Amino acid sequence: MAAIVIVGAQWGDEGKGKATDILGGLVDYVVKPNGGNNAGHTVVVGGEKYELKLLPAGVLSETATPILGNGVVINLEALFEEIDGLEARGADASRLRISANAHLVAPYHQVMDRVQERFLGKRAIGTTGRGIGPTYADKVSRVGIRVQDIFDESILRQKVESALDYKNQVLVKMYNRKAIVAEEIVQYFLSYADRLRPMVIDATLVLNEALDQGKHVLMEGGQATMLDVDHGTYPFVTSSNPTAGGASVGSGIGPTKITSSLGIIKAYTTRVGAGPFPTELFDKWGEYLQTVGGEVGVNTGRKRRCGWYDSVIARYASRVNGFTDYFLTKLDVLTGIGEIPICVAYDVDGVRHDEMPLTQSEFHHATPIFETMPAWDEDITDCKTFEDLPQKAQDYVRRLEELSGARFSYIGVGPGRDQTIVLHDVLEG
């Protein structure tokens, strides 16, 4: 039995899709425990590039059963568009299963998301506008719509009307928008009921029975540690807990059953949207990483902010997730750049911080303290073992490992599934 949780260790876009694609073919179930269609990822299989938004990368596995867990918020229109798009390219999404307890994104959630961001103006968080935050807000306010609700029209209508009683007051009186008609929302959900019904399961029961039978489960977290609503750079965060603890809650797999916590981390750092970013680059090297690394958001098309590797964040992510292993990605992007700065600590008002500063204000004013290592000039994209890497690349990886709080078990040297060096197999412990 193995229950492995995959967690982004930075601000997202670390390459979680690649890690899931590699491990997904070796497990029985791949579960997405949190998030929605607000965080895309790219997977390259057989030379074909797939851009996924709501579905877990495990949907491309030929053997694993992909599951959307109870912690996911699901836009049904986006779900079936993504399924249809995959099947049009020959992929088989028929094994997909969905927790009956997952919450649904309603059209009014997207409306609320957009008007709230517009109202905030310069104070806007920079959401994707897909209604994820308002859906989670309804969940914790106990007025959300769950997957199971669309199979009982009476309950569905009651819940939609209840939710809109308040939202229409806000839309009309505060934002000067038209009221949303409840019956239109009800019919929107009902139109998907027949297609959705065969996919719906008691995911917690299925997954725990699988583990009891000695099967392997992979939990594919969305977003990343620094976007966690509790542990991230609040308020510039997502609305869920994309950390290892959140994966347990969002899948229904108890924390004592998790055998490995695998952090995914880039050989440099990126971020999308607003918020503090100590190692951010505003010079030619920022543009270089953006261009060579292909740092454009899958979901939004926005260019990612780029900076050097931040070991303070890595140590923090190791701590809050209990990482047993790291999967380092995009090492190849650093080939030929001369020297590579590594952030080893922060300076905050003249005081050195080796760990995350206590307050948001301190983090916002943190200045990185760098040490520098020489880069390598050799092409590493065909390297199959750690020993195949140039010595300077080996030294860089080992230094990151020393600084980051967990062993480096996988090293990505290119975008392809086969462009990965395996030092330790997390399925073997």
Swiss-Prot record:
InterPro entries: Adenylosuccin_syn_GTP-bd, Adenylosuccin_syn_Lys_AS, Adenylosuccinate_synth_dom1, Adenylosuccinate_synth_dom2, Adenylosuccinate_synth_dom3, Adenylosuccinate_synthetase, P-loop_NTPase. Binds 1 Mg(2+) ion per subunit. Belongs to the adenylosuccinate synthetase family. IMP binds at D13, E14, G15, K16, N38, A39, G40, H41, T128, R142, Q223, T238, R302. GO terms for biological process: 'de novo' AMP biosynthetic process; IMP metabolic process. Homodimer. Substrate binds at V298, N299, T300, G301, R302, K303, R304. Keywords: Cytoplasm, GTP-binding, Ligase, Magnesium, Metal-binding, Nucleotide-binding, Purine biosynthesis. It comes from Corynebacterium glutamicum (strain R). GTP binds at residues 12-18, 40-42, 304, 330-332, 412-414. CDD domains: AdSS. Its EC number is 6.3.4.4. It catalyses: IMP + L-aspartate + GTP = N(6)-(1,2-dicarboxyethyl)-AMP + GDP + phosphate + 2 H(+). This is Adenylosuccinate synthetase. The gene is purA. It holds the Pfam family Adenylsucc_synt. Mg(2+) binds at D13, G40. GO terms for molecular function: adenylosuccinate synthase activity; GTP binding; magnesium ion binding. One of its GO terms (cellular component) is cytoplasm.
